Amino acid sequence: MKPILSLLTALLLAPLAMSAFGAEAKTSLVHSPNGDGGLIASDQNHPLKVCWPAFDYDGKAVGTEAAFSTAMVAGSQAATAHHAGESRTMTAADGKMQVRLDCRSYKGFPAEEYDVRLTNLSKTEPTGITSNFRSLKLSVGTPESARAVTLNVLRGSTCKATDFIPESFTIEAGKERVLTTTCGRSSNDYVPFLELNLDDRNGYLFAVGWTGSWKARFANTGNAVEVEIGMERTHFRLMPGETIRQPSVLVFARKNQTRREFKTLFHRFMLDNKVPRDSKGRVIPPILAVASGGGNKTPQMMADILQYCVENKMPFDTYWVDAGWYGAPHEDELFSNCGPNWGKYVGDWRVNTTTHPTGDLLPIANAVHKAGLKFLLWFEPERMTDSAPILKTHPDYRRGQLVDYGNPDALKWIQDTIYGIITKHRIDVYRQDFNMDPGPVWRTVDAADRVGIAEAKHIAGMYRFLDDMRARFPDILQENCASGGRRIDMEMIARAHTYCRSDYYIGRKPKDTAFILGQNATLNLIPYLPFQGCEFNCVPVGDDYAAFSIVSSGTVITPSDFNGGIIRRKLTTDETAWFKKVFDVAARMKPFYMGDFHPLADETGAGDDVWCAWQCDRPDLKSGFAIFFRRGAAKEESRTFELGGITPNAKYEVECYDGSKKTVGGSELRNWTVELKPRSFQLVFYRVY
């Protein structure tokens, strides 16, 4: 085998391998048989260079008939405490099309990231046709003994019990696997974190940053695996002066690690480098929320829910007002949640004055802030029904029901509208939903020589909407729903938390399917999406196994979903005591999700016949928790789990969910044996004694 090379170092040593300079040219990532192969984070010994995208220009592969020159962007080389970066451009010989590649190498992690933008430098003429554009095209060398490689992924969110279950594809020599999401929402089909395993301890994770339709191809040639990642459909010319962005891709190496160890490292990378931070640079923590539907019949119902929480000293830190609070004056029925009209008035962001006579939500917002909680409000800014008043003067602001974020005037209008509501109500958590598939709209809009442009402009506009909001309200938390977990990708995770990771949790479901999904989503998804959660209303009161299957780094409960609790009836003393017990423990667990996440089992699927377990450890606090589930049909009565971050010669105080405590040695805690009855769990908190 060849010496170990990082993707960037390979380019330094063999620049003619770049796809910009040769037909179907490849960059070689060399895998080492001794276990330490893979990407090497750039440092003084491995200077940062670039890997060019691949595409056709006017029907010819870039680097053959169409010549492109390359250049460093002056002043682009920069370094921070977390990463080093630089930018380069490649420009067509016709002087029109220019591709800019922004590269970033992360310190302390085997990770490199590529962000791509295309510009027409001409002020008078369109470019030639760019097609089959791939933000990343490279070749990964395989071990000499390997004839097959494995691609591990998670299914996306489709409101089914099988959301986020693992899938594994074996790619034999001479075969390929193509994954894509075609509807326009990034995690509808697959979660775009694609794990290529070269053997049991080495491989690469490709994390796609694109909140639209992406496509990834993995082809095993026998000696290497060719990897191509980009938008699903591209065949366009750029208009004079026009700029668009393309998917970003993060490449993260697994070097001599088990897959569980690798997921712990990647989770740490996400916390250190990707999750949203406030104006002081601090990670914005996950939330524990109590919710009221926006479609309540009177504002007093919202106030009653808040008062219930205050009187019973519930540990919630956020008050959540969901859909249904907006639209032309109308009276809602006494529904327990959002009411029957929540979808009818989307796009009309006037407060419903029949329910809220003041014409705003200040009575509840002010009361929430007075009680010391954060105020969350639901929006769906990208969709607009026929009820929207703006359509009378600006019908061009939407296409179908999709607000045209590629139209600067439409984008400014929705920004001014939503930002104004945020300012008036001092909103702490902005919740963004998106309940449509935009892909068909984009395909209808695109001309034959502009395929992909409507999508690219909409996605860029959506990022600008969120980024401008962050600049204006630097301490706001953005939350990303999209019909429950259908827009989970690297770009959105860097901007928002997700507290409705699947809509399958809404309402009671057959047997334990919702609770198994809860376990799966936390174990399988948290390495990529550290701050997540879902609705609690699928949980029967008093069912601890169900409750802690659902509780994650964040959780939300709507009390009225429990047979109209608070709104239509008083919650009983027993119900209140159980809610308080569960959520006091959830609040205790929450800070540990800010530390190291250790999967204690491999990814679990939808079956009821396995154990599921994970651990959250805070090295800075010398404490953490671990939780273990024996599902209903699991045959093993006991399991021994290897916990992470435990000091073998230390003493630990261990406290179980039932309140029992004992002191154990680190070696015992590190190899923790759990004996459980079917359909039961054990939750243990530990700290150095």
Mark where each language-model region is.
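Glycine-rich, aromatic-flanked loop segments that form ligand/cofactor-binding clefts
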Residues: 51-72, 192-209, 256-276, 312, ...
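Bacterial N-terminal signal peptides
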Residues: 8-19
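Aromatic-lined carbohydrate-binding/catalytic grooves of carbohydrate-active enzymes
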Residues: 281-416, 425-429, 439-441
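Polysaccharide-binding surfaces and accessory modules of carbohydrate-active proteins
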Residues: 24-222, 232, 655-658, 663
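C-terminal beta-strand-rich structural cap/linker in extracellular carbohydrate-active enzymes
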Residues: 665-689
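Active-site-proximal substrate-binding groove within the catalytic cores of carbohydrate-active enzymes
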Residues: 41, 58-63, 246, 436, ...
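Short Pro-Gly-centered flexible turn/kink motifs
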Residues: 236-255, 679-686
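Conserved, mostly hydrophobic/aromatic
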Residues: 116, 241, 319, 368, ...
